[in-house]
């Protein structure tokens, strides 16, 4: 079971070490990082590297590039949520610290993140996601997916701006024994962290069916 990057790792296990997985649950993920996703994550890494405290990655752990990492998180967070949610929650309302409430919210998310994450780790994870492409060693993405034999559940979140419904439908279309569920949500990609009841119901049904068919 893997959401986002975890889903990418689950796909790789299914392809490279198939005996490790009896079934797959791929949540808000993709077979290949898109050009748009690569562009966004590249800007996030640039924000970190432009921080004077980055020091080419050789910063002291007590003085990491906080401003750059906070900005990277803000850039990422825009892709994690949807315009529908932002409009309903913030619209063009005035902020307390900035001109607009949405700016205050993004600043809060950035500051919260730097208290629990390391900049170099963030860069490495970002590069890992950019390199994700299951077609490596196969003639195409489709042929790679067709080689996956495990029962598979693909879960998409409505309004996911990071990994589109089309990308996730491709997984379900070409994996031979796959089913696809779409969770209605205004929270976009982060819906898998928020729509816990819907997620739980879908997972419970899939795992029960697998147990009954074993």
For every predicted segment, state its role.
Residues 7-18, 24:
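Short glycine-enriched nucleophile-adjacent loop
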Residues 20-22, 26-112:
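Alpha/beta-hydrolase-fold enzymes
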Residues 108-109, 124-144:
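Active-site nucleophile elbow and catalytic-triad environment of alpha/beta-hydrolase enzymes
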Residues 137-142, 150-151, 161-173:
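Short alpha-helix in the alpha/beta-hydrolase fold that links the catalytic acid
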Residues 148, 154-156:
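Short beta-strand/loop motif that positions the catalytic acidic residue
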Residues 169-170, 177-214:
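Catalytic active-site module of serine/aspartate enzymes centered on a nucleophile-bearing elbow/loop
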